[in-house]
A protein has these predicted regions:
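The feature marks the mature, well-folded catalytic cores of soluble enzymes
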Residues: 2-262
Length: 262
């Protein structure tokens, strides 16, 4: 029934591109509301019941919550554990809110499966990419990724963000980095891998990135970190600190297999 109130949702903006609305991907260094994490539990990724991983995640959550909000997703099985952790951390010291919510995922990589946020300077919207576990049936890291693939729109709708639907274009958050002023970086080894968008050319992928991220320039690095199982995500090897300045992982050891890559 038409209530007379016009709403904007992902269905209405599915055929509209962020760049057409004046949206861009901000730099990581820009002020933002908070950080999304997923509580680890997948046995194939986290040994010993994820005990050591959970200790490390707790340290990261504490560090982030000192300066911004944390949105912590946990499965129904681990929600109570994650909630108790959040309560303990916030009791021990003055922190920003740690908001624990239930979400079923296949693993704990929020950076890759979560929404990419874009802004026009006033409003923030999300982008939902296709996720296929870093390579799908070609060289993906696990056989079932349907829960991960639903996480981005779930989070956007839960938090009230309008979101653009970029599917079936496959992309992970860690595979792209922005300077916030129209330049993004990616690696050829990842975005041109056979398990992601094999039917698209480099030029076509470049245009996709410009259209969805509001970019004017796409920097293609040939490789990333040696043996990175994500097909060498750019965020592991190079990241913008500010426009015109990057931090780079490299080695001076000519015998190291990373030497020719960076």
């Amino acid at each position: 029934m038409d209530s007379g109130k016009k709403t904007i949702n992902h269905v209405e903006i599915r055929k509209i591109l962020p760049v057409q609305d004046g949206y861009r991907m901000p730099g990581e260094y820009e002020p933002h509301r908070g950080c999304i994490l997923i509580w680890p539990e997948r046995p194939g990724s986290w040994r010993n019941g994820a005990r050591e991983a959970k200790k490390a995640f707790a340290d990261v959550i504490r560090a982030i919550a000192k300066s911004e909000e944390v949105y912590l997703a946990a499965s129904g099985k681990t929600f109570s554990e994650a909630e108790k952790l959040a309560q303990r951390l916030q009791t021990d010291e003055a922190l920003y809110p740690i908001r624990v919510f239930t979400a079923e995922t296949d693993d704990a990589w929020a950076r890759d499966v979560g929404p990419t946020f874009v802004t026009d300077g006033q409003e923030v919207r999300g982008i939902n990419w296709e996720f296929n576990a870093w390579g799908g049936t070609e060289d993906g890291l696990y056989a079932s990724w349907e829960k991960d693939n639903r996480f981005a729109p779930f989070f956007c709708e839960k938090e009230g963000y309008t979101w653009y639907d970029a599917r079936p274009f496959v992309l992970e958050g860690g595979s792209v980095h922005s300077d916030g002023e129209g330049t993004v970086m990616v690696t050829e080894s990842c975005l041109l891998s056979k398990g992601r968008n094999p039917d698209l050319t480099k030029e076509e992928i470049t245009e996709k990135l410009k259209a969805y991220l509001g970019a004017e320039k796409v920097l293609w690095l040939p490789r990333g970190i040696y043996m990175d199982e994500t097909n060498e995500h750019v965020d592991n090897v190079c990241a913008f600190l500010k426009p015109g300045e990057v931090i780079l992982a490299w080695t001076d050891n000519r015998e190291d297999p990373q030497y020719p890559l960076s």
